[in-house]
């Protein structure tokens, strides 16, 4: 924020941050993805953060000892946001195959496949964290939509069955707890005793 006056002024805001400070192996360096948006339409949030010839972002990179930083444009449209999050890869299409489960297929040309995935999966992993979506990178020249949709439909069906079973179990547990509470309340009710007159012996 200190390097970008527009953030301090409020015309640019940071929407989300995904950082991998300790990658799974030494061959992959630390990396951060930052999603930004502008309050004012005429302000370019990405340009404001990067600065002229990368001057602003370079200062941040230097402070973080060379950590790679991707500044991407946030979007209300999940498909566009996912495409932006995979920068610097070029995306051909984003298919939101399961909006409820937040699962997307991202189609990229063959020459962009490794870039979209990133070394040891770092790029797509950070994109998924940033957007909150499960992202599957697909080769656009080999993508079989019908086959992929069938697989997704099966996964959705399994999820719905699991959710139904979970709901049934929760309802059963709630009913058992209610019955137990009712029984406990009944047992705690005070017992009233009726005093009967003591029997008297007849006098002869």
Model-identified regions with their sequence ranges:
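RNA-contacting regions in translation and RNA-metabolism proteins
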Residues: 1-196
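Single conserved hydrophobic/aromatic residue that forms the stacking wall/gate
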Residues: 195, 200-204
């Amino acid at each position: 924020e200190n390097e970008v006056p527009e953030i301090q002024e409020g015309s640019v805001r940071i929407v989300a941050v995904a950082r991998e400070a300790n990658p799974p192996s030494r061959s992959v360096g630390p990396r951060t993805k930052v999603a930004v948006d502008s309050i004012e339409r005429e302000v370019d949030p990405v340009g404001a953060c990067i600065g002229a010839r990368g001057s602003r972002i370079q200062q941040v990179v230097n402070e973080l000892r060379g950590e790679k930083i991707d500044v991407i444009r946030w979007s209300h449209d999940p498909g566009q946001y996912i495409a932006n999050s995979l920068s610097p890869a070029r995306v051909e299409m984003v298919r939101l195959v399961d909006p409820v489960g937040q699962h997307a297929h991202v189609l990229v040309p063959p020459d962009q496949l490794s870039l979209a995935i990133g070394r040891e999966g770092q790029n797509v992993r950070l994109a998924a964290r940033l957007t909150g979506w499960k992202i599957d990178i697909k080769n656009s020249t080999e993508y079989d939509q019908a086959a992929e949709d069938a697989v997704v439909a099966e996964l959705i069906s399994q999820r719905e069955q699991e959710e139904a079973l979970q709901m049934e179990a929760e309802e059963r547990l709630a009913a058992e707890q209610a019955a137990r509470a009712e029984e406990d309340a009944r047992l705690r009710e005070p017992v009233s005793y009726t005093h009967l007159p003591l029997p008297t012996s007849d006098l002869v």
